[in-house]
């Protein structure tokens, strides 16, 4: 059952990522129709901006994420022996280098991981998590975060965030060009085409325009769908590492029962946390939820 869940989640992720790339190209094609009356120009623009932005995002250091979330590095075992030992042992079981260890001085129990590859991984936990969890529960949470690193989830989420940003940029470019009347040549060409093909070109233009306007919203929904799926996969992978679903279940129950929201959290970092720092109590995931409901995560773990 465990390995079936892992395989199913991996397949679903592949489909989501492929769909994401296709969606970006579709947005580019729509912008090409709106701006140049030629979808190929838009495809090239989307591909170039997308590749450049992804490269910049992937090259960004995880230290930036740690700084944004006020995380301080643990440089020696003596500073946090239980946390250090847990991270070290889970990394060893996962077969990856030991990630850097950080602590966020916040009373709300939570954790997150960064690093686009296992060699550049880092794990951060809040002070509240260390104070509230037993060691076997902490192992479940750390195994979950180690799984994110091992499964290259941070790289995937970075690409997804970059693609959402690219779509927003492309949409903004199109809207600005329309607003400032920079499409005069395109409109003239389109008018000539419409004389020959009736209202077909006008309909295509309107559909493309509506698609570009809605694209950032749709892209954000896809990004969060990917994030929710990777949380399920990390839970299953954590059980694979610890062989003890009860530890992770107990940790989720304790975190769910804690009503404190994180005092200082970067809005752009919400999706990387073990549990949503906004403390949503919904039982069903919404389109724009970065995490599946804790009740759903617990149910899946109990069925393993």
Curated annotation (Swiss-Prot):
Pfam families found in the cross-reference section: Peptidase_M48
UniProt-annotated binding residues for Zn(2+): 144, 148, 231
GO cellular component: plasma membrane
Domain of life: Bacteria
Topology within the bilayer: Multi-pass membrane protein
Keywords, alphabetical: Cell membrane, Hydrolase, Membrane, Metal-binding, Metalloprotease, Protease, Transmembrane, Transmembrane helix, Zinc
GO aspect biological process, one term: proteolysis
Cellular localization per UniProt: Cell membrane
InterPro entries named in the record: HtpX_protease, Pept_M48_protease_HtpX, Peptidase_M48
Parts of the chain that traverse the membrane: 14-34, 39-59, 159-179, 202-222
Record: active site: 145
Hydrolase among keywords: yes
Co-factor binding comment: Binds 1 zinc ion per subunit.
Cofactors, names only: Zn(2+)
GO molecular function, one term: zinc ion binding
E.C. number(s) listed in UniProt: 3.4.24.-
Stored NCBIfam families: PRK04897.1
Family of the protein in this entry: Belongs to the peptidase M48B family.
Protein name per its UniProtKB record: Protease HtpX homolog
UniProt lineage: Bacteria, Bacillati, Bacillota, Bacilli, Bacillales
Record gene name: htpX
């Amino acid at each position: 059952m465990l390995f079936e869940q892992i395989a199913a989640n991996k397949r679903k992720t592949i489909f989501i990522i492929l769909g994401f790339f296709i969606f970006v190209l579709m947005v580019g094609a729509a912008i090409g129709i709106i701006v140049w009356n030629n979808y190929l120009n838009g495809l090239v623009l989307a591909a170039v901006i997308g590749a450049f932005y992804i490269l910049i995002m992937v090259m960004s250091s995880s230290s930036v994420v740690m700084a944004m979330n006020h995380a301080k590095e643990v440089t020696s075992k003596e500073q946090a022996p239980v946390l250090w030992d847990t991270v070290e042992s889970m990394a060893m079981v996962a077969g990856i280098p030991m990630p850097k260890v950080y602590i966020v001085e916040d009373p709300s129990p939570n954790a997150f991981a960064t690093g686009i590859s296992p060699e550049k991984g880092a794990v951060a936990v809040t002070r509240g998590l260390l104070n509230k969890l037993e060691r076997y529960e902490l192992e479940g949470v750390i195994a979950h975060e180690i799984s994110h690193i091992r499964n290259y989830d941070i790289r995937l989420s970075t690409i997804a965030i970059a693609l959402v940003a690219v779509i927003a940029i492309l949409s903004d470019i199109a809207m600005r060009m329309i607003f400032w009347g920079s499409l005069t040549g395109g409109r003239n060409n389109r008018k000539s085409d419409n004389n020959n093909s009736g209202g077909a070109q006008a309909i295509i233009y309107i559909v493309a325009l509506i698609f570009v306007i809605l694209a950032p919203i749709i892209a954000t929904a896809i990004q969060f769908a990917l994030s929710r799926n990777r949380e399920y996969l990390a839970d299953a992978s954590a059980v694979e590492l610890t062989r003890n679903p009860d530890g992770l279940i107990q940790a989720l129950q304790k975190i769910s029962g804690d009503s404190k929201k994180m005092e200082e959290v970067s809005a752009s970092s919400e999706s990387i946390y073990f549990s949503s720092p906004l403390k949503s109590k919904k039982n069903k995931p919404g389109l724009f939820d970065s995490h599946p409901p804790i009740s759903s995560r617990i149910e899946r773990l109990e069925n393993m």
